[in-house]
């Protein structure tokens, strides 16, 4: 049987050797180039491939069409992925006659995602394991072929557990690979109700919070100890690293972070105390805890901190223009949850952001971006990140007010972009799924899909083209003048505070708001062209989390990128959306306050939108970039989003409004 392998790290080497021992013909091995910033304590897949005489490649993007064609040309029977860091696209997965298989270092469906080995220790789990499963679109969600459990001892740390997991992987593959080779294996679907997800960990995640119980701090220390970057704390302005620790439950209670003794070096936590057995100062060498306490100049009663004591915290200042809008107000809520951000906002109204007025990290001015240009320029200069969210984005306005769409969406936003260039500020710009237009691809890819629009006399494309031209201008500024930017493309985000019913009354709202108005008023639901158009509906909370990760940009990998943010799993026609909404409406506790359902009515788009309208039959995103760059994927089902959105609007209707 011929296999193509994607592999990295010790588990990658384990998988490759297991394939060779099972008699597989390995046509090629794909791995990652070594990163000089990493601690290379693990074996080299490239060296293993060379020892076996197998061709090895380390492309920056294995999903590129050129590599896909080469892999197809190899005619593999199976694809195997062992600790490879990137998602593989459908073209690669489907290139093998038997399919693609991934070895994941957890007992799926728990701990899907990145760094499960560290996370199980952080969370104090008593067992983990390895899972061989089929590869599907969603990360780590395919049918399970085999699993092997690994017990986690109280004294295990990341390295000892890593070795156990590698051994378990070898045992599992020794049994599973021969069975796959002869086609005698079974598989079962994962229980989605038991699924959990974890994200990539960074060195910053090793920061010790002394206000946690000692058990939690101990778990963190062992989860990130050498050869990982280590858990760390601060004495004054100095940073120190904890490599080994021990829990003490018999110490008298004290304020968290208080040094209880220096020989041994024991620190109070919220529950119990932690002995620092070994550690080092940031610029020092590995040493015993008591020597570390002496080196740091500590005495009993001194305090340790989570941050450098003498350094004032510098929050990231985020400027949101259009802060009262659907995305703006939800994003503000998410940013204010994190103490690292301060929000400055401008909008012509404040009804959706009233809950933030008075918050110490929220600063709002009521104004119009076409008038308050001096205020905007000053705050672009003052802030770190700029999100210009002001735009006319309702389809009926594209044909009803095309010039206003161009003036606001293009001309006013171009001024903001130029100010970001002038003051060298990072801009996160809301592109749109509309830029793909009538693209014929099964799923729309940020880097390869064509952007296809209709003739000039179809004015509905003025929004799409205005946004596309701004995308191109931003890209050019990034290429020629060093503008830091990310373009994000929302795909049909839905949720509470999307538009309002008054906007729906004049036809200037998104589809679901218009449908809810029909139900509230007892008028027929209008299905434009029969409601055949398919869209992928995305919960606002999923979308905002992705946008937050772009702003946070922990890995510094979002600059110069275009990122689709949508939910390919939530694809439905407008008619299906209306039918699901009706079901939710009929079972809602407030149903009896509203008139009877008046039925569906099919309407031609030219009658509803005007002669300049042209529709798109389908619009499905590829979210490969979001998965790779953000370690993000949507999790919220469409029916929950519909329920939440409907409930918000029904709760907002005052008695008597439905009869107006």
From Swiss-Prot:
Annotated spans, Dehydrogenase ArnADH: 314-660
Pathway assigned to this chain's UniProt record: Nucleotide-sugar biosynthesis; UDP-4-deoxy-4-formamido-beta-L-arabinose biosynthesis; UDP-4-deoxy-4-formamido-beta-L-arabinose from UDP-alpha-D-glucuronate: step 1/3; Nucleotide-sugar biosynthesis; UDP-4-deoxy-4-formamido-beta-L-arabinose biosynthesis; UDP-4-deoxy-4-formamido-beta-L-arabinose from UDP-alpha-D-glucuronate: step 3/3; Bacterial outer membrane biogenesis; lipopolysaccharide biosynthesis
Residues covered by region (Formyltransferase ArnAFT): 1-304
GO BP of this protein: lipid A biosynthetic process; lipopolysaccharide biosynthetic process; response to antibiotic
Binding locations of (6R)-10-formyltetrahydrofolate: 114, 136-140
Binding positions for NAD(+) per the UniProt entry: 347, 368-369
UniProt binding sites for UDP-alpha-D-glucuronate: 393, 398, 432-433, 460, 492, 526-535, 613
Residue numbers marked as site, Transition state stabilizer: 102
Site (Raises pKa of active site His): 140
UniProt-listed Enzyme Commission number(s): 2.1.2.13, 1.1.1.305
Top-rank taxon, per record: Bacteria
Catalytic reaction annotation: UDP-alpha-D-glucuronate + NAD(+) = UDP-beta-L-threo-pentopyranos-4-ulose + CO2 + NADH; UDP-4-amino-4-deoxy-beta-L-arabinose + (6R)-10-formyltetrahydrofolate = UDP-4-deoxy-4-formamido-beta-L-arabinose + (6S)-5,6,7,8-tetrahydrofolate + H(+)
Pfam families found in the cross-reference section: Epimerase, Formyl_trans_C, Formyl_trans_N
InterPro entries, per database record: Arna-like_SDR_e, Bifun_polymyxin_resist_ArnA, Epimerase_deHydtase, Formyl_trans_C, Formyl_transf_N, Formyl_transf_N_sf, Formyl_transferase-like_C_sf, Lipid_A_modif_metabolic_enz
Keywords: Antibiotic resistance, Lipid A biosynthesis, Lipid biosynthesis, Lipid metabolism, Lipopolysaccharide biosynthesis, Multifunctional enzyme, NAD, Oxidoreductase, Transferase
Keyword match NAD: yes
Catalytic center residues: 104 (proton donor), 434 (proton acceptor), 619 (proton donor)
Gene Ontology CC entries for this record: membrane
Entry GO MF terms: carboxy-lyase activity; UDP-4-amino-4-deoxy-L-arabinose formyltransferase activity; UDP-glucuronate dehydrogenase activity
Function: Bifunctional enzyme that catalyzes the oxidative decarboxylation of UDP-glucuronic acid (UDP-GlcUA) to UDP-4-keto-arabinose (UDP-Ara4O) and the addition of a formyl group to UDP-4-amino-4-deoxy-L-arabinose (UDP-L-Ara4N) to form UDP-L-4-formamido-arabinose (UDP-L-Ara4FN). The modified arabinose is attached to lipid A and is required for resistance to polymyxin and cationic antimicrobial peptides.
Family: In the N-terminal section; belongs to the Fmt family. UDP-L-Ara4N formyltransferase subfamily.
Record text on subunit structure and interactions: Homohexamer, formed by a dimer of trimers.
Protein name: Bifunctional polymyxin resistance protein ArnA
